[in-house]
Each structure stands twice: as structure tokens, then as C-alpha cells.
Design a protein with these regions (language model features):
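N-terminal membrane topogenic signal
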Residues: 1-8
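Flexible, low-complexity extramembrane segments of multi-pass membrane transporters/channels
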Residues: 118-121, 830, 948
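Soluble extracytoplasmic regions of secretory-pathway and membrane proteins
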Residues: 7, 14-822, 836, 841-916, ...
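Short hydrophobic transmembrane-like helices used for membrane targeting/insertion
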Residues: 834-836, 946
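Residue-identity detector for glycine
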Residues: 827, 832, 940-943
Length: 948
């Protein structure tokens, strides 16, 4: 039985290893193709090495204990027996061979489970071995922060692992003793009722007792180590008024743990000594003292001190520790370098202010990402099998002007092919890639209410500054399945009229399929026998897999966390993706934890230390370190020297497009609402708590999202690309401040908070929304549209600082109403994405969101006009000329009829520039038109012909 079981066990292990090898080989080929083979082997050997070490330790501990048990008690007898009135009638003994088989099976299963779990902790081991100091220390134990980030997690892992191993070893040993009679359980039972009638009596031989006492000593010694580690764990306490160790923790619990360490160590020594001399009274006495120490020092004393000493004097006692919490939380979330600026709000905005901030005004965003995505899907999807996943926001220099641009990639979704065309060949060999993108400025709209497109159609037409020479997208956000390229059949490239254009992949992406063995392995890996049997493959064929952006970066560096919105960049004629990567930890001392981010894990330290770039055509991936001071990324750089590159090696054109990531900003904003209060008493009383304001989207009230904006900061000389969000006081709607994160080099990463005067009312977003609803004319017009078969969508309300004041801009879109079933199927809107498939869009016909009105508020004035220019001019009482340039003189003409022709020409040009959002030229044409009309007016009065 034993031999058969051993053979079966090792056979299962061999099958698992073989299956793992089948999966490992394609992974290695993929890493090697990207140039990250050393990274692959470091991770693989670390996983297997650490897992094997855990397995070996478990086997060693259990086998040594079983060997000792067999030597100490070689006999065989019943371990469980019950006695009736007429003697023993039931014995629950287990035969030696059966128990041996059960033990072997138990050990094999347990060792595999524990070793597998241990292998997943490989990065904790490597971070411990390669840890880099942070240069700062905690305020209680004066240990380097690196100890908490790297050493403490490893010590906790080792201690917990050993404790579990020795507890399992004790249980296995007890099972062995139960089997051979060294441990016996006897009791009485009722024959009539068949149930025990008394508590069972447990007896154990002296040798078995000594063995189990020795194991108990090891377990108690591990508990002593646990008390030592718990001292450091006090820095993550949540018991006080702030996160981290408080007065009771520092003055009582630290002392209590030191006492318990001594008591536990002494008790363990008593157990070790009595494992040889066996004085049970001494063991019971020592155990009682140890338990008493735990009850008094770990439980009772802290409760009494907290209730009778700390609570009545909480602010005085806890003040130093609240200050630690404020200081270390701000450091952990990189808020300690936030620059505070007083923002004295004015009620006036002059023509000179408009002129000074013309670039800001030209880049006011009137296109919301959500309706714009629907519009793109309607006017630029081109074919059923194309789709846009989300809309990204970036900035480009176009015609030598700094422009904020919205972009969305046109990706191919093979599941949207018609049923007859949804064949294996089409899915994996022909329809292999998306094509091009749609891009539009944030502020321009056509006369039909649609975006003016900088990049459009297939093949793409584009602005010269947004040239695209490689529009193919093999790697994107929706590329979930593998494809085969350089096969004997051509790939679909893009549609043209009634025919299609085909191509053959010319890039370096993909893993070569050189041999029958590789075909077999890939067929097994993807559970697809067609790879093995297809005749379309050639010696040059390649297979592309792991093509989705988030997965691609995550497989190479799974120890990093990734932003939820990788964004597209057009650079040097190609399409790239930039993915923000973070180093995080939940072990930063005294720092408040934040939840709900990155796989829903808690964290209390975060840095955007790495920028990842991915070539959409070749799939090349590069990791650039942008924060060289971060100890976590420095540690990973030591572990993986071939993975990371310095930021100065990033191509210069891509550097222009790095931006402050939204996920990080949202975490920082959430933290800053409370931790902007640096005064301990104010923090304790929560006197100045802020909150993120709400806004309306459509008819729903939701929390306002951070938004990108091009603007000139106060005291700065030029405009820059920022991510910003306003704040309101807790449970209030007026604005109290706003936070801005800078994206342009060399100021990338700088945070500025502008604090508004508390004694003056500055409208918050919901107050503006309420004023819109209360404005009779606007409310009536919106209601009428809603009653005439249109859905009114109120987009993002943006609070835009101009000089030392704010203007508020909210776009209004109209969309043909959907049927109720369609509306319910779309779900709730999410940032940057509208959960409407292309098939749904096709069925919706004319349901295209069109920008029809723009609401602008300034001070106590609020208007709704057909376009932003009219709205700004109306609310500010200033004609919007972003650039006051010298206008050229109008050429001489002979009579008034020619003046009329010229007036019409300038009028038409002005309309064209208005649609384009070219405020400078628009203003110039209006100025010329005004001059001509004045001449016509004066000449009409005099009745004479004019020469001008």
C-alpha cells in the first residue's frame, strides 16, 4: 500500500511539473523576445527556490518528529476506546499500514499546498535580501523605514510559517502516538443510546509526553518572537484618535510585549528542560504564570490605562502621536512637498486678463470624455468590427500652438465579426490588428455639434504635427487573444470602398514558431489544436500573445501596481502607449491606510516611480525610473538590473507626453481632504475637514473627477498641462481650495494647493449646478429639449482658474432618446469609458451626442449660449480676442459695393475660425469686419463713393 501510494504521489508531482514546464516554456520565449530573459529566470528560480525551501523544511520537520516518535514508542495498539457496563465493546484503532498511508498522503498534500503558497511570497524574500535604505527613521524605535518596508514583512512571514509548520508537526505526531497507543483516549458510553456518558480520559506515555512538551517549547518560543514583532506592529495601530501607536501603545504595550517576551522565553526554557526531566508541576506553574502575564500585561493593563489615564486627557496625551501620524502620512503619500498658496479671489476679469490667459481660454475643454466616446463610435468606427475603448487626454504642439487633445484608438474586436465571418482563420490570422485613431481638440465643434477631428478615417488623415506612418495597432486595450502573423495568408489592414486592403506584418513583435515542437506547445498552452494542424504557417511565422497593455506590463513586472488608464501617444509617426506604474506598501509606519485601489488591497505608501512605454506595432516594452529616491524601486532595480532604465533614456518626444496619473492623484486627493490639517488640535477636532465636491452628469449626482487642463498658474509666465480638482468644506458646497499636479518637465510631479479665503463665498460645482437649475430660461430650454425626443446630457462642470478668479464651464449635449431597454443595458457611466458596445451603437442609429450649448458662470452671472465664445463674451462683457495682435490694413477698394463683398468675405472667414476655435484669427476677422461696416455706414450717410 505504501509503495503504491508513494508511486501515485510522485506520479502526480511529475505530471504537475510537466504541465508547469509546458506553461513555462512559452512564457520564457515571450520574455526572451522582449529582451527580459534575465527577469524571467530571476522570478522563476526565486519562486521555485523559495517554494522548494519551504517544502524541504516542512518535510524535514515532520519526518524528524515522526522518526523520533517511532524511536520513542515503537509499539502498536488501540488509541481510542469506549467502555460499556459489561466492559470494552468498541475500539477505534487504526492499523499501522493504513495510518502510514494516510500520513504519507497528508504530508504530500500538505507539503505541496504549503510550498505553493510559499512560492508566491518570492518577492518578500528578494526585497529582504536586496533592500535599500530609505534615509529616514520612525519616531519610536528609530529604525530605518526600509526595515518596515522590507525586513519586517519577511520576519512576519518566516515566524508565521514556522509556527504553522510546527503546529502541523505536532498534530501529525499526536496522530502517530494515537495510532500506536502511546496516546490513549478512553471513555464510557451508553449501549442503549450509543452516546458517551462521561468525559473521555486521556493518557499518554512519559516519552510521548516529553516529545510533545519539546514541540510545545518551540511553539512558545515562536510566540515570544511574535511578541517582539508585534512591538513594531504597534506603529500600525488603529485604536487611537489617529493611525499609529498612541500613548498607551508606546508607554504600556511596548513594555507589556517586552515582559511577555521574557515570560514566553522563560516558559519555553522550562518546557525544554522538562522535556528531559518531566516535572509537570513546574510546567503547570510556569504555564499559569505565562497566561497570567498575557492577561494582565497584554489585555487588562492597556485597557485600564486607556480608560482612566488617556481618555480624560486625550488631546494632551495623544498630541505627539497625532503629529507623527500627520507627518508620516504626508510623507508616505508624497504630500509633504505640497506647496501651499493663498488664492485671493477677485470678482473682476478684464480684457487684459483675457489677453494674458488666452492659451488657457483656447484650451477650455467643452468635450466630455463620455459623450465624446459615443460620438467617436458613431462617426469614426467605420466598420462593425472596430471599436473605441476609451478617450485619453493629452497635449500636443500643433501649428506651434499648445493644444489639449482628446484621442481614442480604433481597435479591432473579432467577437464583433458577423457570425459567418467569425472563423478561426479570421480571428487569428486575418483580423489581427486595429487601425489608427480619432483625435480632436477639446474646444472645437462643427456647426452640426460634432467634434472637429485632427485625426480621422482609414487610412488616417491628420494634421501635419500629428503625422502617423504606422497606424496599425497590434497591442492595445482590447487585444485579448493571440494572433499569428507572417503566415501564408495576408492580414486585413483596413477597408477601402467595396474592397479591403491587406498587408503582411513587417515588425519585430511576436515569438517565432520555428518547429513542430513549438507548435505543439503553443497548441497545448492555448488549448487550441488548430495551431498544430493549420497549413497557413510558414518558417517566418510568429505568434503574438499577451497583447493587452495592462497584462503585458503586469507579466513582466508583477510586483508593480498599474494605473487603470494607460493612454495613447502619437510620436515620431508611430503609436505608443504610456502606462503609469506604482510602487506601493502597506507597511509605512504611522501612515494612514487607503483601501479600494489596485486589486482592492490596502496601502499606506505610494510612488509613481516608473513610466512604462509600449510600442503599439512591435510590442516593445520599456520601464523608465522617474523617481530615483523611492527605496522600493531602488530595491527592485537591484533585484532586476536588466529591467529598468533611467528616465533620461526615454525618447525626448515621449517625455513631452508624460502626465501626472489620475489614480495616484485620486488617492492623494482623498488623503489630503483630512491631512491638509497640520495643526494637531485642528486635526483632532476635525475642524477643517474638506471633501471632494459633487457634480451632475446627465441627471445623476456623482463625485467630481479630476480633470486635465492647460492653464497658466498664478505667478507663472507660461501655460502648462495640469491635473486639478477643487475642494469644498465637509458637508458644504462652497469651494475652499483646489489642488493642481504639474505634468510638464522640469516641474513634473509638483503639487500645489491653492487655499481660498474662508471669509468670502466662492461658488462650488454643485452651487453652480443649482444656479443652472434655478435659471428660468435655461431650465425651461433644457426641459423642452427633454420633452421633444432628445436626451439632455450635462457634461463635466469645470472650475477654471483665470488669473485670480474662476470661471465655470459646463457643456450641454443632445442625444436622441433610446428605448428604455437600451438605456438599462448601458449601465452607469465610468471614467473615460461608456459601457456601450459597437453593436449597440449601430442599433441606435442617430443617437449621437451633439454639443449644442455651453453654460458659463462668472461671479453672479450665468449664461447659456451656442458656443463658448458667445458664452464667455456674454458673461464677461468682453469680446473674446485671445491675442490682441496688430490687424493688417484692408486693401483699397473703389466703391461701397466692393466693401460689401469684402465684408461678406471676412464674415465667412470669421465663421470658419469660430468653428475651428482659432480665437486669434476669429478676432482679427471681426475687427476687419467692424472697420468695413463703419466705412459702409459713414459712406452711406454722405452719399459718396469711398476709397479705402
Amino acid at each position: 500500500m505504501n509503495k503504491k501510494l508513494i508511486i501515485i504521489g510522485f506520479g502526480l508531482i511529475a505530471v504537475l511539473l510537466l504541465w508547469s514546464g509546458v506553461s513555462i516554456y512559452p512564457d520564457w520565449l515571450w520574455f526572451e523576445n522582449l529582451g527580459f530573459s534575465p527577469v524571467f529566470w530571476t522570478m522563476l528560480l526565486s519562486k521555485f527556490g523559495f517554494g522548494f525551501l519551504v517544502w524541504l523544511l516542512l518535510i524535514l520537520i515532520i519526518c524528524l518528529n515522526l522518526y523520533a516518535a517511532k524511536r520513542l514508542n515503537p509499539g502498536d495498539g488501540p488509541g481510542v476506546a469506549f467502555k460499556a457496563a459489561d466492559g470494552y465493546v468498541s475500539q477505534l484503532g487504526v492499523s499501522g499500514r493504513a495510518l502510514n498511508s494516510l500520513l504519507i498522503a497528508f504530508i504530500l498534500i500538505l507539503s505541496f499546498v504549503v510550498a505553493s503558497k510559499g512560492s508566491f511570497q518570492w518577492d518578500i524574500l528578494l526585497r529582504y535580501l536586496y533592500q535599500q535604505p530609505s534615509g529616514s527613521t520612525d519616531p519610536i524605535f528609530n529604525r530605518d523605514i526600509g526595515f518596515y518596508l522590507f525586513s519586517l514583512p519577511f520576519y512576519i512571514l518566516v515566524r508565521d510559517g514556522l509556527l504553522v509548520l510546527f503546529i502541523f508537526a505536532g498534530l501529525v505526531t499526536m496522530g502517530w502516538y494515537l495510532k500506536n497507543g502511546a496516546l490513549q483516549i478512553e471513555g464510557e458510553f451508553s449501549q442503549a443510546e450509543g452516546v458517551p456518558t462521561s468525559l473521555p480520559k486521556i493518557t499518554i506515555t512519559p516519552k510521548a509526553k516529553k516529545h510533545l512538551i519539546f514541540l510545545g517549547g518551540i511553539i512558545v518560543l515562536l510566540l515570544a518572537w511574535g511578541y517582539h514583532l508585534k512591538m513594531y506592529g504597534l506603529l500600525y495601530s488603529t485604536q487611537g484618535p489617529a493611525f499609529g501607536a498612541g500613548y498607551t501603545d508606546v508607554h504600556i504595550k511596548v513594555l507589556a510585549y517586552k515582559v511577555l517576551i521574557i515570560a514566553s522565553t522563560a516558559f519555553a526554557l522550562v518546557l525544554f528542560v522538562n522535556a528531559f526531566r518531566l516535572r509537570m508541576k513546574l510546567i503547570w506553574l510556569s504555564g499559569g504564570i505565562w497566561i497570567g502575564a498575557v492577561l494582565v500585561f497584554a489585555i487588562l493593563l492597556p485597557i485600564l490605562i486607556q480608560k482612566f489615564v488617556v481618555k480624560p486627557n486625550e488631546l494632551a496625551k495623544e498630541s505627539p502621536y497625532i503629529a507623527y501620524n500627520i507627518d508620516y502620512t504626508r510623507k508616505a503619500y508624497n504630500l509633504n512637498r505640497t506647496k501651499k498658496v493663498d488664492f485671493e479671489v477677485s470678482d473682476k476679469l478684464s480684457a487684459e486678463d483675457i489677453k494674458k490667459h488666452d492659451v488657457t481660454i483656447q484650451n477650455i475643454r467643452i468635450w466630455d470624455e463620455r459623450p465624446l466616446l459615443q460620438t467617436y463610435r458613431q462617426i469614426q468606427t467605420i466598420r462593425l468590427y472596430y471599436d473605441f475603448n476609451n478617450v485619453d487626454v493629452d497635449r500636443y504642439l500643433i501649428n506651434n500652438q499648445y493644444r489639449q487633445v482628446m484621442l481614442a484608438t480604433r481597435e479591432l474586436v473579432v467577437n464583433q465579426l458577423p457570425p459567418r465571418a467569425n472563423t478561426w482563420v479570421n480571428r487569428h490570422l486575418i483580423y489581427t490588428h486595429g487601425y489608427g485613431l480619432a483625435a480632436s481638440p477639446v474646444n472645437e465643434v462643427t456647426s452640426e455639434g460634432l467634434p472637429r477631428l485632427f485625426i480621422k478615417d482609414v487610412p488616417p488623415s491628420f494634421e501635419p504635427d500629428l503625422k502617423i506612418e504606422r497606424p496599425e495597432i497590434y497591442y492595445g486595450e482590447k487585444t485579448d487573444q493571440y494572433v499569428l502573423v507572417k503566415t501564408k495568408t495576408e492580414e486585413f489592414d483596413y477597408p477601402r470602398g467595396d474592397k479591403n486592403v491587406y498587408t503582411i506584418y513587417q515588425g519585430s513583435g511576436g515569438v517565432p514558431i520555428k518547429s513542430f515542437l513549438r507548435r505543439l506547445l503553443f497548441a497545448v498552452e492555448f488549448l487550441d489544436p488548430q495551431i498544430l494542424f493549420t497549413t497557413y504557417l510558414s518558417p517566418e511565422s510568429k505568434i503574438m500573445y499577451n497583447r493587452r497593455i495592462a497584462r503585458r506590463a503586469g507579466l513582466i513586472a508583477p510586483f508593480l501596481d498599474y494605473d487603470g488608464d494607460p493612454y495613447v501617444v502619437v510620436s515620431r509617426g508611430k503609436i505608443y502607449w504610456i502606462q503609469d506604474a506604482y510602487t506601493t506598501s502597506d507597511m509605512y509606519p504611522y501612515s494612514r491606510r487607503s483601501y479600494g485601489h489596485f486589486r482592492n488591497k490596502g496601502l499606506n505608501y505610494i510612488r509613481n516611480s516608473v513610466k512604462v512605454t509600449i510600442d503599439a506595432y512591435n510590442g516593445d516594452v520599456a520601464f523608465y525610473i522617474i523617481d530615483e529616491k523611492d527605496p522600493i524601486v531602488k530595491t527592485y532595480s537591484s533585484i532586476f538590473p536588466d529591467l529598468f532604465k533611467p528616465f533620461n533614456e526615454m525618447p525626448a518626444d515621449l517625455k513631452k507626453h508624460i502626465r501626472y496619473p489620475r489614480d495616484l492623484f485620486e488617492i492623494q486627493v482623498d488623503t489630503y481632504t483630512k491631512y491638509h490639517m497640520e495643526d494637531v488640535q485642528v486635526f483632532y477636532n476635525q475642524e477643517d475637514l474638506w471633501q471632494i465636491p459633487d457634480e451632475l452628469y446627465g441627471d445623476s449626482r456623482q463625485e467630481m473627477e479630476p480633470y486635465y487642463i492647460i492653464m497658466k498658474l498664478p505667478e507663472e509666465e507660461k501655460e502648462e498641462f495640469l491635473l486639478m480638482l477643487p475642494f469644498t468644506p465637509s458637508r458644504k458646497d462652497n469651494m475652499i481650495g483646489w489642488l493642481a499636479a504639474r505634468s510638464d518637465l522640469p516641474n513634473y510631479g509638483s503639487l500645489l494647493v491653492y487655499k481660498l479665503p474662508k471669509e468670502k463665498l466662492v461658488y462650488g460645482p454643485m452651487q453652480i449646478e443649482a444656479r443652472v437649475d434655478q435659471q428660468t430660461d435655461i431650465s425651461r430650454e433644457l426641459s423642452l429639449w427633454g420633452q421633444r425626443g432628445s436626451r439632455v446630457i450635462r457634461g463635466n462642470l469645470l472650475a477654471i482658474p483665470i488669473g485670480d478668479t474662476f470661471i465655470y464651464v459646463e457643456p450641454v449635449y443632445l442625444e436622441a432618446k433610446q428605448e428604455e431597454s437600451e438605456l438599462s443595458s448601458t449601465g452607469s457611466p465610468q471614467r473615460g469609458a461608456v459601457p456601450v458596445s459597437s453593436q449597440q451603437d449601430e442599433s441606435r442609429g442617430a443617437a449621437i451626442p451633439e454639443l449644442k450649448r455651453v453654460i458659463v458662470a462668472f461671479g453672479n452671472r450665468l449664461v447659456m449660449e451656442e458656443n463658448l465664445d458667445k458664452a464667455l463674451s456674454s458673461v464677461l462683457d468682453v469680446q473674446i480676442f485671445p491675442k490682441q495682435l496688430a490687424f493688417p490694413s484692408i486693401p483699397q477698394i473703389q466703391d461701397i459695393s466692393n466693401l460689401g463683398v469684402l465684408a461678406l468675405e471676412h464674415y465667412n472667414k470669421a465663421k470658419d475660425y469660430l468653428r475651428q476655435g482659432n480665437w486669434a484669427e476669429y478676432g482679427r476677422e471681426l475687427e476687419n469686419l467692424e472697420k468695413i461696416l463703419k466705412e459702409i455706414s459713414s459712406s452711406g450717410k454722405s452719399g459718396t463713393s469711398v476709397k479705402y
